[in-house]
Amino acid sequence: MKKFSILLILFIGFINAQKLTPAEISLINQGDINSALPIYQTTDAHQHTTLLNLSTEINPKDPNTAVLVKRMKESLLSTDGGVGIAAPQVGINRKVIWVQRFDKAGEPLEYFINPVITWRSELQNLGPEGDLSIPDFRDQFYRSKVIQLEYVDLKGQKFSEMVEGFTAVIFQHEIDHLFGILISDKKKKEENDSYQAVDAFKKSDSVTR
């Protein structure tokens, strides 16, 4: 009985955690709900902070989630060549993304709720990336060539699939957003890690000589 009570409390806590806050609901429904939501920019201090925050799961069956999904698509379509967008980029720190599926016929845009990468290949590719939230920034990044992905749709149905190539890169980029990871910061970290590795090698080399 005690074990059941603990599980029930955990379940209720999980459900409550997925509930949107009044502020989130207000933002999602502001203005014309059929229009695009503004895309947050790192050049704005408040918006930048939102982009750096961790995102939490969302209730896929909440009617407001459907509105968010729809408006995020409009936001992506309003850009010049954007291939993906994450909820933090429209001010909502929840786990929702849109990705253009270059691995499918017609290259459709598809949404993904509470996406999780459960596996990444060790084999990586180096390729260019930009970001709708970071003006005038583009650089080369390493990403896993293949990933295993799990997610749900608006009905709460669970899916799992393997994705590879450029589409896998987009997924990794957008899911990074859900963890508050921006490619500008990612580049700084990679450069710092590279510097530390080289510096450590030089120190080690000087000792052995």
Which ranges hold each PLM region?
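Positively charged
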Residues: 17-209
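Sec-dependent N-terminal signal peptides
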Residues: 4-13
